Structures are given as structure tokens and as C-alpha cells.
Amino acid sequence: MTDTSVPTSTSPRLTSLSHGGGCGCKIAPGLLADLLKRSAPLPFFPDLLVGNDTADDAAVYKLNDEQAIVATTDFFMPIVDDPFDFGRIAATNALSDVYAMGGKPLMALAIVGMPINVLPHDVIAAVLKGGESVCAEAGIPLAGGHSIDSVEPIYGLVAIGVVDPKRVKRNAGAQAGDVLILGKPLGVGILSAALKKDRLDAAGYAAMIAATTKLNRPGAELSRLDGVHALTDITGFGLLGHTLELARGSNLTARVRYADLPWLPDVVGLAEAGIFTGASGRNWDAYGKSIGLPASLPATARTLLTDPQTSGGLLVSCAPQAVDEVLALFRADGFGEACVIGEMVSGEGRVEVV
């Protein structure tokens, strides 16, 4: 008989201690934009190549003509109940932003908040070990961090990397005629929602863990390709939100082919059964006015396209002649489902789904 159980490992369940999980617990994009508008403009720093004036994945500071520092931080509440897996997912997700800038990680610091009077100490230790294991896989030290006693469990990393300042890849700079390539299948938010509702079987759980703990290492290699014009990763704002950011930053329209999108197992069926996250609706509220969805698409298309991804795949905008080399880089690192999902065309900061 096939085991259909999903590991929980803790009592109480980690996901029962938080009101959200993974990148789905980001502040809603509309509210975040309003909050950031209230901040004072950042003073000019000539060596700050990427700062907070754009919606990019990390900050980049030039040290010299050959080296720039990539700095980012990312943390969230549990998306799964297994503490080791939670630590792995959070660490993989944090390092992804370094790769998404074309950088190579150098070291990381842990961000830890745990209800220490609620969770057994061995559970908290397992979360930390999960993060350590991913840093070891990435070949970097987890060199320190900071911890607090918090009501809800949170874990993540400050990730520091290095990149050639001439090779920084941004979520802008795409060119008309570029091809869009996605590195990982979609649907993590829906699978995590199914897990909370005890609707996810062992196979679905395994697929989710495999996707969310796979390091986006091809990003560091993609930075060396002249044909790669823009790069980002798909996380809490969903495929539509992050593709729209790339389109706006490039002053173009992204055309996404719905039939070509890769999905994790069971995601479409779960969406049809009404399983989704609240972040999906918040994403649509923020971006829907700039999205074209034909009436011929399935009724679940909007939910699927706005599904928040945790530790999602890289989105590459590259010249047509670079497609084979980009796909070869992905597949050499085990990203067998990397595929072409659309193209960039003339327009003014929209996403058109066809």
C-alpha cells in the first residue's frame, strides 16, 4: 500500500502557529508600494548600482571595476510543518535573490524568531540545521545571525554575494523580441494551501519540497551570457506580478503563453477544487489593471497565474539566439522543466496572457 501521509514532525504544527506562510505572507503589493512612497528618497551614492528605487531582487554596491557586492534579506513564516524542510526552503529562497542578480553567494547570516515557550528546542534546532544544509550545498558559510523570541515562527537569511559590476542582471533591460524562459514549475502557493487543509498527499509534498529547495544556481552562469538581457525570480507576487515588474522596468509588454506554463503535480486540480491562498487575490488587486486575460482561458487561470511562489524559478529574458544556451545551462544543473513561456513585445508595461 502506498504511503500517502505527509510529515508533520512537530506538535503543535508549525503552520498552525502562523497566520501566513512562505512568500505568501509578504505585505500586499499595493500596500507596500504606498508605504515605500512615504519614505524619504535615497541620497545619491555613485557606487550603489541597484538600490531601493526599483523593485529589484537585491541591492548591488560596486567595490571596484571587477567586483560588486550583492546584498539581500528574506525571511518568512512556515510553509510546511517539517522543521528541517522549513529551514531548507527559507534558506534556498533567500539565496535565490543573489542568483537572480547574476551573483554568486559568499556568506549568509540567519534571521531567527521562534516562540521558545511553545516549540521544543529540538524543533527549533532542526530549522537551523535545514538552513545550514542549504548554505553548505551552496558552498558558503552560515557565519552568524540574530534571534528573538517571537509569537510566530520566522526564519530566513541575510545573503551576501559578489558579481561583476558589468554583468549585473536586473528585472529591467529586456528587449523587444526577447524570449521568456522560466526555470521551475509553478504552484507552490496552492500546494501549501492544500497542505494546511490536509489535502496534499506524499507525492505532492515531495514535489513541492524538491522545487522549493533547489538552488537557482544557473543565475550566476546566466550573468556571463551577453544574450541574457534581464533576470528575476518568481516569488510572492506570482508569475504575473514579477513578469509585470520586468515589463514595466523594460517599458515593454510581456506576452505569456498559458498553454506552455509548467505546473507542479496536482496544482491545476487543486485550484479547480477551490484551493488557493489569500495572497493570490491581493496580487490580482495590485496588478490586475495591467494584465490582459482572454475569456477563453479556464476559470482558474487568474488564481493560478497570481499564485504566490516560495523559492520559485528564475525568469529569463534573452535574445532568441541565446535560448538554446540558456536552456542548456538550466538542464545541466537539473532544471529539467525549464522552458520557453513567452516573449517580450513592444508596449508599455503590461502582461498579455494568450
From Swiss-Prot:
Cofactor: Mg(2+)
GO biological process: selenocysteine biosynthetic process
Entry annotation: catalytic residues: C23
Residues annotated as site: Important for catalytic activity: K26
Root EC class: transferase
Cofactor stoichiometry and binding remark: Binds 1 Mg(2+) ion per monomer.
Quaternary state and interactors: Homodimer.
Function field: Synthesizes selenophosphate from selenide and ATP.
Name of the molecule in the record: Selenide, water dikinase
Native organism: Paraburkholderia xenovorans (strain LB400)
